Amino acid sequence: MPSQPPADFTDFKVADLSLAAFGRKEITLAEHEMPGLMSIREEYAAAQPLAGARITGSLHMTVQTAVLIETLVALGADVRWVSCNIYSTQDHAAAAIAAAGIPVFAWKGETLEEYWWCTEQALTWPGHTGPNMILDDGGDATLLVHKGVEYRKTGILPEAENEELAVVRALLDRSGLDWTAMSSEIRGVTEETTTGVHRLYEMHRDGTLLFPAINVNDAVTKSKFDNKYGCRHSLIDGINRATDVLIGGKTAVVCGYGDVGKGCAESLRGQGARVIITEIDPICALQAAMDGYQVATLDEVVDKADIFVTTTGNKDIIMASDMAKMKHQAIVGNIGHFDNEIDMAGLAQIPGIVKDEVKPQVHTWKFPDGKVLIVLSEGRLLNLGNATGHPSFVMSNSFADQTLAQIELFTKPDEYPTDVYVLPKHLDEKVARLHLDALGVKLTTLRPEQASYIGVEVDGPYKPDHYRY
């Protein structure tokens, strides 16, 4: 693959093109660890099921995502890509994608203005009104299209409730994109993460969803693998790279015990930490207790713990008033999608507090009494801001789900009226099968009479949609 883009190709913006050769080496290594994606590439390349697809991708621009992008292209798609987080881009991966002649607009450490400019570029298709497919992580590309349509319809800009919405408001006010025409051509969106899925269900409930969506997050091969096993790996990686603090013997609080929280708690306990869970859901709280964790409220333990990790996908989980009660040198980080789980704005407004950068995405906050907190990635995803995210094998599951979901929506538009769907079970099982050989797994095969007895086909699917794995 080239280390420089074609001479006439300028439709990109990355930090440093000279990193492309390094990025290509890491992409090649990742391909070996991503058997699901590579198998799909081999199976579908001749048929070109995504020929004619114009995919706007908004998902962390990492080495693993580069393998996803090149898989989509290999299946016939045209792609324009941005990262879905200002800190998550791996600049060498972005450079390698640009060098391959694929439009990409992403670099680590974007401002909010730059971030939303990049998203606008990914939705801008020369010669077309826009994309006809969206691949989203967190829902920002989908949100921008919906806000644009609303603005064109009503002439009313969204309220600037926070700094980010103020940036979106300014973008919509100046943008020349025809959001209404764009939305009419979009066949659907496939959404990667819990937070984006919440947005989709809210829009559908309110009657404002403009096109069909597949909830990739709740595919079993995504939520039970990426969310749990991926976070189990990458949380510790992020904390270690950021702080080099020994985790063994420390007390850690994990806010939330969903799939992400379960993976985080397991990894911290595996390092020897005493882990305490906070939960709102009685079922998840009972699970945590049965798994051997103390379950308490944040108020009960906020002045006793050494490490705090938010995993909920909700807002205002750790407030400035909570941080004021924490121990000296407590570490505070988030692994939920957005930056509103930790009250960073409130922390900055404490009179006399002083923020100091230790290194990129690691800051100390010194209170007037001399107490210092260590905050990772400014409250954004610490596993991507302070480390490199989930390992390739886990992401192969999620990105195989994404690829099959894109094919499903693009090739079968009549089967998906506007609604929010989950990935069909047979595709979920297909993704799992594609990863078994790499782990040396040998499946038992049902005999016909056994399959008949439990009411399934010999080749599956084996579980009903409501089954909880």
From Swiss-Prot:
Its cofactor is NAD(+). GO terms for biological process: L-homocysteine biosynthetic process; one-carbon metabolic process; S-adenosylmethionine cycle. It comes from Streptomyces atroolivaceus. The keyword DNA damage does not apply. Its EC number is 3.13.2.1. It catalyses: S-adenosyl-L-homocysteine + H2O = L-homocysteine + adenosine. The keyword Hydrolase applies. Binds 1 NAD(+) per subunit. Its main location: cytoplasm. One of its GO terms (molecular function) is adenosylhomocysteinase activity. Pfam families: AdoHcyase, AdoHcyase_NAD. May play a key role in the regulation of the intracellular concentration of adenosylhomocysteine. SMART domains: AdoHcyase (SM00996), AdoHcyase_NAD (SM00997). Keywords: Cytoplasm, Hydrolase, NAD, One-carbon metabolism. It comes from the Bacteria. This is Adenosylhomocysteinase.
